[in-house]
A protein has these predicted regions:
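Histidine-acidic metal/acid-base catalytic patches
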Residues: 1-4, 9-28, 89, 93, ...
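Glycine-rich, proline-tolerant flexible connector loops at the mouths of alpha/beta enzymes
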Residues: 33-53, 113, 117
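Transmembrane beta-strand segments of Gram-negative outer membrane beta-barrel proteins
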Residues: 1-3, 61-64
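Conserved alpha-helical segments that form or flank metal/cofactor-binding pockets of metalloenzymes
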Residues: 55, 64-66
Length: 271
């Protein structure tokens, strides 16, 4: 298991202090929201990309995953029209290329509002999603990356693929080496999933994992998420991928300590 943390957990102004703390703690991997770095990441130059990679290398940290690709594009939709779907697919394909350039082998597709199906039947949505992700899986393989589908709970305004079982069924139906399953502790807890069973039933397709709390609250020992069940299940399936802490930042100036506390808690439970 490789421990990472997402860069959404601090402000840009705190990044150097957080990076130094992560180096001190021996955290060697980071997940990034590219939209936090560049206004349009798909237009980042190779010079900008290399500069960012090298900046983290100074702290012995490697970029291993992307998230929040559609954060700045609420206009892009999977199910609204074929034109918007094509535009969404191309935009995500550009992120797959960027991930390949940056050495990030996993991209988390959450984006609950971009995949709302509304009145569309589940069967029709499944048919569209299968073709949509199959094509992106081919692109992912081209760039030695993998797009990981994240079941998102209804509390996050998601109405398509809201449980771990639904996510697993879609990934198995797509059956692409470029598409994997991503699970998230908060999403599973909110959706009422059996966390242990969801992980153990899907060890063969589980390719990325988030340790989070509902509404991206601070990660600590809490009653609403069974982190110990998740940790035990990951050990049972001999999970060797990335486990990434995902939480929103607190007040400016307090996030170095929040990151340190979260890393300490997660290591105590998951390692």
């Amino acid at each position: 298991m490789k421990l990472a943390i997402s860069n959404i957990a601090w402000t840009n102004e705190e990044e150097a202090d957080v990076a130094a703390k992560l180096q001190e703690l021996g955290v060697r991997y980071i997940e990034i929201a590219p939209t936090k770095i560049w206004s349009d990441p798909t237009k980042a130059t190779i010079e900008q990309i290399n500069e960012y990679i090298e900046w983290w290398k100074k702290y012995d940290i490697e970029i291993v995953a992307f998230q929040s690709m559609l954060f700045a594009r609420p206009d892009l939709k999977m199910f609204e029209s074929s034109e918007l779907r094509d535009e969404t697919r191309q935009y995500l394909a550009d992120f797959l290329r960027l991930a390949g350039d940056m050495g990030a082998s996993r991209l988390v597709f959450g984006s609950p509002k971009n995949r709302q199906r509304g009145r569309m039947s589940t069967e029709e949505a499944d048919d569209i999603a299968n073709r949509f992700f199959s094509e992106l899986g081919d692109v992912a393989k081209q760039y030695n990356t993998m797009l990981c589908i994240e079941p998102n709970a209804p509390q996050y305004n998601c109405d398509y693929i809201t449980t771990a079982d639904e996510g697993a069924r879609l990934v198995r139906a797509i059956s692409s080496e470029g598409i994997g399953l991503h699970l998230d502790t908060a999403c599973m807890a909110l959706a009422g999933d059996d966390i242990s069973k969801s992980i153990q039933d899907n060890g063969d397709i589980l390719k990325h994992f988030h340790i989070s709390a509902p509404m991206l609250d601070r990660v600590y020992d809490r009653d609403d998420v069974d982190y110990r069940a998740a940790a035990d299940a990951l050990k049972r399936i001999d999970y060797s991928g990335v486990v990434s802490i995902e939480m929103r930042p607190g007040e400016h100036g307090e996030n170095v300590k929040r990151v340190e506390d979260a890393v300490s808690f997660v290591r105590n439970i998951f390692e």
